[in-house]
Every structure is written in C-alpha cells, then in structure tokens.
Amino acid sequence: MSNMQQKTDVILIGAGIMSATLGSLLKELAPEWEIKVFEKLASAGEESSNEWNNAGTGHSALCELNYTSEKSDGSIDISKAVKVNEQFQLSRQFWAYLVKSKLIRNPQDFIMPLPHMSLVQGEKNVEFLKNRFEALSKNPLFQGMEFSDAPETLKKWLPLIMEGRTSNEPMAATKIDSGTDVNFGALTRMLFDYLKTKDVELNYKHSVENIKRTKNGLWEVKVHDMNSGKIEHHTAKFVFIGGGGGSLPLLQKTGIPESKHIGGFPVSGLFMVCKNQKVVEQHHAKVYGKAKVGAPPMSVPHLDTRYIDNKKALLFGPFAGFSPKFLKTGSNLDLIGSVKPNNVLTMLAAGVKEMGLTKYLIQQVMLSHEKRMEELREFIPNAKSEDWDIVVAGQRVQVIKDTDAGGKGTLQFGTEVVSAADGSIAALLGASPGASTAVHVMLEVLEKCFPSRMVEWEGKIKEMIPSYGISLTENPRLFQDLHTSTGRTLGLNEKETVHN
C-alpha cells in the first residue's frame, strides 16, 4: 500500500472491548457505513481487554464497597452503586441481543454466573456492611442479597477463607448469587469475528502515528503498517480512539481544545494466581474486601474465581506497580512524552496533591513475594507460598484534569469520553469500571457524536437494549423481566441454581 489517501466513514483505533462494542452498535444501526479498525498488536483484545490483564468482574456494585460511601450521619450513599449496576444491565442486554440474534455464540465462553460477596473485619466495618446491605436491599437491582455475621454461615459461604482462622475479631459478609465473571478478551474476539463477517476491515500490526484535521473537515490518520514497513494515510468522517492507555497521546495529537489540560498517570496491576487446583476448587465467588484507610480505590483487595479458557482459576490482588509505560506493550517514554505545555501545571498540581498515592505505589513496588503472601493470608490464613505465582496484569492510565470540585490536577478514577465539539472525533480515557460499562459508554459516544441520528436510531437501540433511557430502579417489573430473559439467553439462570 502506498502513501495515497484512502477514505472511509469510520475509523476505530484499538481492537479492544470499546472499539468492538462501538463497531457492533454502528453495524446494527448504520450497516451501510464503512468501518476500518487499526490495532498495533497482532490480534484483538490483547491489551487491557485481555482476560489476564483485568479482574474479569462484571462490575455491578454487588460487592465492590468503594461504590457505596458512608455519609457524615452514618447513612449510606448508594447512588454510585445504582448507577454502575444500571450501566452493567445495558451491557448484559446488548450481549443477550447479540446471542439471541446469533451474531455471537456460546455465551458460556465469555460470561459465567458467580456469587459476588463483600467481606469485612472489625466492629466498625461490620456495622458499615450491615448498613450498606440494608440500604441496597431496598433497591430492586440488589434483590437477593444476603447478610451474615454468623461464623457458621460464613464457614459455609467461604470455606477457604474461614479455614484456619484464629482471630476473634468480628467478621461479616454479604452474598448475592446473580454476580458474573466476564472474560472480556474472549468477548472482544467474538465481537471482532462478527464484525469481520459484516465487512469491517480489521488491520492488525498497524500502529497509528498521527491524527490531524484536513481542510475539508475530515480526519486524516497516519498509520504505520508494521507488516510491510509502509506508511498509509486514511481519512474518515468519524474517528474513535479506543486505545486504552495509548488513547491520551493520540488524543493530544488531534489538537482539539477538549484535549488540553488533561494528563495521565500510569498504574500497573499485579495479581497472585493459584497453581494448586485443589485450592482453586475450594472457592467459588468473587470476594471483595475493604481498601485500607488512605489507600486509593484501585487497591481494594479481592479473591476471585475466574473462568479462563473454560478452566476455573483463582486470583488474588490487585497489587500496584509502577511503570512509565501507558500500555503493557508501550514505551518507557510514554509518561514524559505526554507532558505538554498545556498540561504541565495540571500534572505538577496532581503530583503535589497525590503524595499519598505516590507513597502507596512506592510501598507496593517494594513488596517481596512473602509480603504479598502476608496480605493474601488476611483472606486465606492457610495459604502456602509454593501454591501462588505472580502475574503482571494490564496498565491503567488514571486521568488527571482540572475540575471545579477538586481544583487543578485532580486524579479521576472513572471512565471518561472526551469528544470534539462537532462530534467528529472521540476518545475513551480512564480505568474502572471500564469494560463492564462498555455499552453505556459507547451509547454516550453515539449521543455526543451523532445527536442528529439518535431519533432515527432510537427504535433499533431499544430493540437491542430495552432499558435504554429508562431507570430500572424506578421500573422494578421491567428489571425483573429483563434480568430473567437475559439470564436465560446468556445461560446464567440455570447455572446460578446449580452453584447455590
């Protein structure tokens, strides 16, 4: 291929879960549009979406304590939990539509039912968990949640965690059987297999080097074909930058005003993986603890049953690491290269503000295998060092920006869409809850970037995602109907019963 320009309707940068979701939505809504995908790696879903590079939790705030905060009067604010759960329901509905329409098959290859549990120790934390349980139980999205502080019940729910426990400190847990384990790598690959059948052009080992606006208002994307060594130029009416940690540097190249005063701080994750299958079989849940006082939200410890390559696995973490790379396969110059005249003050302000995070990362990097084992033994008292290995997970780039509430250089912990005023280009930045809310986030991209089409598309969107634009909290019967029907389609209901 030569230097000549090639025109298309849509360019998706990065072959992860976000581009896969947006591409799938667009192919259902505007099947005639030409779509090209450019991915630096040799196949889809190999960076943040890869099953070993994320926790695989279907984040719906069933067990993640950082989505419910305690107010000054002791009551629990569940608004964030409700929001995250509602967003996950959109993903669940879209996946069920794809399976029912036979656009993807074998849902058990990417989603499995799994109890989600919260576990706390200490009188104050037990009281918090009970208050959280009572607050969530009033909401239809959290029906079926159980609470217990009785040791005999906890032994039944958590045999591996309770075995060998000598402390008399009070403990409590909540349990809900409607949780899920999601293999986002497998799902991403399935979606791209489907897109290939719809004539979407998938270009692997193609690295995007630059993005600039042409005189006629299109976007020109400069691509390095790593197979041939040639440089290609592609133009499109709409570009989506879904390159995980690599999105910020590409967004900066666009020069759009919305890309200014935004920085990124990379945090790498590590998990411990159990290599003793006898131990793996003794646990069947995702169990989330409470972050230590002063620790950032990404540090919440959890012990997870996972299904990877259709095999049961057991992981514990995350432990944080530090690398200046924005991608696992990135460059050590990524962080310094992202500092620009327009964001240097934002970055410096964050550095001053986030001394606690810096200290936490330094402490985490210094941890030995035995120190990590000590943390694991807070969950599994009888854990043996020889049964556990360390796995390096993906890089997450936390967004740093100036906000009215937090001032200059405020660290963001969510997922964020940044788009041009005219909607011709959009980028996804940030980390958790990430992939779980992919459908909600990509619908936000459609709303921001194609506002004039939304009336025309609304009927089809509601066919695919029936609760689009509706609060399920306020429509409990609709939630129950959709939860049952999507569970049936995705093969979750029967298996939920089997494991109870």
Curated annotation (Swiss-Prot):
Pathway entry: Carbohydrate metabolism; tricarboxylic acid cycle; oxaloacetate from (S)-malate (quinone route): step 1/1
A GO biological process held by the record: tricarboxylic acid cycle
E.C. no: 1.1.5.4
Family matches, as SUPFAM superfamilies: FAD/NAD(P)-binding domain (SSF51905)
Cofactor: FAD
UniProtKB keywords: FAD, Flavoprotein, Oxidoreductase, Tricarboxylic acid cycle
Reactions catalysed: (S)-malate + a quinone = a quinol + oxaloacetate
InterPro entries hit by this protein: FAD/NAD-bd_sf (IPR036188), MQO (IPR006231)
Keyword ATP-binding appears in the UniProt entry: no
MF-aspect GO terms: 2-hydroxyglutarate dehydrogenase activity; L-malate dehydrogenase (quinone) activity
EC top class named in words: oxidoreductase
Tagged with keyword Transcription regulation: no
PANTHER family assigned: L-2-HYDROXYGLUTARATE DEHYDROGENASE, MITOCHONDRIAL (PTHR43104:SF2)
Similarity comment text for this entry: Belongs to the MQO family.
NCBIfam families: mal_quin_oxido, PRK05257.1-1, PRK05257.1-3, PRK05257.1-4, PRK05257.2-1, PRK05257.2-4, PRK05257.3-1, PRK05257.3-2
Name by which UniProt lists this protein: Probable malate:quinone oxidoreductase
